[in-house]
């Protein structure tokens, strides 16, 4: 560890004991397994929303709002949390709504409700109609509280073919194509696009400033805000916010980040690419649902996942990447690496009351 990082790690340990304790308490509260009985009415709706908010979102912005209305729950995009530098067309926002939709439907089934999701074009929202059904707590539902985006090196070992088939089956959708790339030449090609995309983003001041604004450099800030990217969730030390801002400028460089992603990709068992059949909001939601099932099934199997979306976020690279992986003119929506590896401290969520309208 560089001396500067070692020193700041020590400082964090001395300064943020209280913040770390609050963070541990917040983790237990956020990622808890709730009871499957005893909820009804608004309380049941709020519990389903809680599970929905455990879905991933770009920079952990939690870019959603939920409206409860008798037998329906509607998920709206929260455009006050948009990230115009990395996501100028709000693509990631609607993918995130899809992830939340899938979690909610899985949770509804566990609580004795069938959820049917439809995209409301007029309101750019997802409307989920709920009706009674025999309760079933599926493996995917049980995995919701354990799923995380694990931004770490994996063990480099291949995934068994039976497990790959389970991942493919979980992601299956009539409106989304999913590609699982596991051979080394294909992964090296993906890595090349990741490095190109990362270099472009790292040289984009607007992107860097936007990312920095969503980083929570210590547990106290992570708990206070309940959103964003907690530094320890990426394997980085916990430091005061003012010091984290200074360190960010020194250590967050194209060279360092590219070296990290080379290690991350080369230690991964494979890469999954998700592409909607059409390039519109409704299909982006479906991409999110497909990916979330994939991520939950991976969690069931003890497989970690993490986003490496640079090839689809940099517009000039996207069509070249699509051609390279055999998608032709279809827009690729998500690039996900997967493999077995460690868990990291989880990100937090805002309370349910903060996302209800």
Predicted regions and their residues:
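Acidic, surface-exposed loops and disordered segments
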Residues: 2-357
């Amino acid at each position: 560890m560089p001396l500067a990082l070692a020193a700041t790690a020590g400082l964090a340990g001395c300064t943020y004991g209280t913040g770390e304790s609050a963070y541990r308490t917040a983790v237990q509260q956020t990622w808890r397994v709730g009871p499957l009985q005893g909820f009804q009415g608004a309380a049941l709706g709020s519990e389903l929303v809680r599970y929905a908010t455990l879905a991933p979102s770009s920079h952990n912005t939690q870019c959603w709002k939920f409206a409860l209305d008798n037998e329906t729950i509607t998920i709206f995009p929260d455009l006050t949390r948009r990230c115009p530098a990395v996501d100028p067309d709000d693509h990631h926002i609607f993918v995130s709504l899809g992830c939340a939709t899938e979690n909610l439907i899985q949770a509804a089934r566990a609580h004795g409700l069938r959820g049917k999701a439809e995209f409301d074009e007029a309101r750019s929202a997802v409307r989920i109609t709920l009706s009674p059904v025999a309760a079933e707590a599926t493996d995917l539902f049980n995995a919701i509280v354990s799923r995380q985006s694990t931004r770490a090196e994996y063990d480099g070992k291949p995934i068994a073919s039976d497990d790959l088939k389970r991942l493919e089956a979980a992601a299956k959708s009539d409106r989304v194509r999913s590609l699982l790339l596991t051979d080394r030449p294909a992964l090296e090609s993906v890595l090349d696009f990741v490095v190109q995309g990362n270099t472009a983003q790292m040289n984009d001041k607007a992107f860097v400033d936007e990312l920095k604004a969503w980083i929570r450099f210590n547990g106290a800030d992570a708990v206070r805000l309940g959103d964003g990217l907690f530094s320890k969730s990426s394997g980085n030390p916990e430091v005061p916010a003012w010091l984290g801002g200074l360190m960010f400028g020194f250590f967050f460089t194209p060279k360092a980040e590219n070296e990290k992603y080379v290690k991350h990709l080369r230690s991964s068992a494979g890469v999954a690419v998700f592409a909607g059949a059409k390039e519109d909001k409704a299909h982006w939601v479906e991409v999110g649902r497909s990916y979330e099932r994939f991520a939950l099934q991976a969690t069931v199997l003890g497989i970690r996942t993490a986003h490496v979306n640079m090839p689809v976020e940099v517009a000039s690279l996207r069509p070249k990447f699509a051609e390279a992986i055999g998608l032709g003119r279809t827009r690729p929506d998500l690039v996900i690496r997967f493999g077995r590896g460690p868990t990291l401290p989880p990100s937090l969520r805002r309370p349910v009351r903060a996302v209800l309208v």
